[in-house]
Amino acid sequence: AGTIAALAVKNGCAVRDVKVRDIQKALLDAGAYLQPYLDLSKDDPDFKMLQRIGCTGILHAIGKNVDWANQSWMRIGDTLIWDDLYLDEYYGVAHSDSKDAVKTSEFVILLSALSRKMPEDVTAITGIEPSEEQTLSRLDAARAIDTLLHPFDRDVDFKGNLK
């Protein structure tokens, strides 16, 4: 509540007019968790990025019950498969149930189409080299999506729906 009030004063607007993404960004900058992922510590350079991507729903976490604790994991070391990507809400790309690993060549083409950048520009920005044999981790995919497409910059309402 304090963060929202401070942002309202800073932006000169009513509390109800403070943007959700502004609240989330302020909380991240203060070191807060938006999602309870255990993959990375707050000190990790990829922490904020993973939180942003998780909030968009483009990559989903899994929950695990360990003893009396509920845990959430983004499985950042796992190989990205097509079924992992939920691009429909943000980009109109239908979800695939395929369990096939995403090849880096396919991923670069996908990002190229979504960003309207040439494949070589996608590679230059993300560092992902296209290959028919090479796959990528969920962490590398999240990094590339965050860096190139910036989905967290799209505003949402208080229910999480895109505006």
Spans of features found by a protein language model:
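Internal hydrophobic alpha-helix adjacent to the cofactor/substrate pocket in enzyme cavities
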Residues: A1-A14
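Terminal recognition/anchoring or ligand-binding modules at protein termini
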Residues: C55-K163
